[in-house]
UniProtKB/Swiss-Prot annotation:
Key word Translocase present: yes
Membrane topology: Multi-pass membrane protein
Protein name (record): NADH-ubiquinone oxidoreductase chain 4L
Main subcellular localisation: mitochondrion
Quaternary data: Core subunit of respiratory chain NADH dehydrogenase (Complex I) which is composed of 45 different subunits.
A GO biological-process term: ATP synthesis coupled electron transport
One GO term describing the cellular component: mitochondrial inner membrane
Record EC number: 7.1.1.2
Function: Core subunit of the mitochondrial membrane respiratory chain NADH dehydrogenase (Complex I) which catalyzes electron transfer from NADH through the respiratory chain, using ubiquinone as an electron acceptor. Part of the enzyme membrane arm which is embedded in the lipid bilayer and involved in proton translocation.
Length: 98
């Protein structure tokens, strides 16, 4: 395993571990998701450069566009939750309590 692969895998695993263990605030969960998506974007971009495939060159940009959509939807949810409930705790997002 090359150092580049190791660092990208470690970044993804740290984001996943942060998402599973530190799920108290919505903002921290969104930051962990963004870290995971960024490591996936970099690994896909490096993979398309390594294989020199023109048919796969749009996949990293598509992933980045979906990541931006996910971030904007997450921030909108964060603002709506903070306005209605007064905090960004993940326990407020339980729909069974409504």
């Amino acid at each position: 395993m090359t150092p580049t692969h190791f660092s990208l895998n470690a970044a993804f695993m740290l984001g996943l571990a942060g998402l599973t263990f530190h799920r108290v605030h919505l903002l921290s969960a969104l930051l962990c998701l963004e870290g995971m998506m960024l490591s996936l974007f970099i690994s896909m971009a490096l993979w398309t450069l390594k294989t020199e495939s023109m048919s796969l060159s749009t996949a990293p940009m598509l992933l980045l566009a979906f990541s931006a959509c996910e971030a904007s939807a997450g921030l909108a949810l964060l603002v709506a939750t903070a306005r209605t409930h007064g905090s960004d705790h993940m326990k407020n997002l339980n729909l069974l309590q409504c």
